[in-house]
Amino acid sequence: MKYAKLGLLSGILLTFTFQSMAADWYVSLATGKNRNQGTREAPFKNIWKAIEKAAPGDTLHIAAGNYPGKMSCGWINMDKPVNLIGGYNADFSARDPLVYHTMLRPSNAQNTTKPIFGTLTIKTRKFGKNSNILIDGFIFDHTLANSYHPREGKPEGFEHGMLTIPPARGTTKYPSIDKALLNAETDGTFTIRNCLFLNGGNYAVLNGHFSGKVRIVNNVFIGNRMMGADVRSTNGKPGMVDFEFANNTLLFTWTRTKAFEDMGFGVRANANMSTNIHHNIIGLN
């Protein structure tokens, strides 16, 4: 009984800490420096630096720019539950994700240091059911990281042909990235909204969630491979995960292989979880 009470008290204190001690950090690729304090007036230069400084529950406000990752590796590792909010201008006086583009858009050359999992990799399962993550106002884009055939599958008027799958490659030095745009292992509440997922070399969003809610709302998925959004329960008990996929536009998902053998799905309702798919535009997957 004493141990049960102690565990309950610890959970309450953890929730209180996440909510009451949360801080705001600012990141601007154009005007920031990593030795800055991370304030609105003196922002960090890179997202990875802000994540290192942040505590669980903090919010990162991120100005326009194509963020290269640590040592320009081409991807971001998020190892604690924080909120990433993009779409600000350089001095954070205005926010409009349609105007101020906060991007994770790796190049083909960065495939030499490509991620194991995703261009945004989130591994926060250990923080438990009281954690919250929001990803808001980002452009995730593998167009430059992919390798397209110069002729095969080339529609009239287009610059390139079909996506090539490693080890094959087109005219680029390296094969396509073949990784997810966003790969996450999470718990608690996980929300993705107001984002663009473009030309993903693998899944656009691949999420294993242990308990709680996943909400993917008001996003655009265009030209990704495999699947637009695949959310799975990693909990052995049924009914522990609620997944909502709403008000998204999801078009032109490509198959796993050139021969159209499988995949090419928009969004999937997986086993042992509650899935609510509504008010979306889904076509040509």
Predicted feature residues:
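Bacterial N-terminal signal peptides that target proteins for export
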Residues: 1-8
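N-terminal extracellular ligand-recognition/capping segment immediately after the signal peptide
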Residues: 48, 56-96
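Right-handed parallel beta-helix/beta-spiral solenoid domain characteristic of secreted/periplasmic
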Residues: 82-170
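Right-handed parallel beta-helix
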Residues: 86, 131-144, 159-171, 187-203, ...
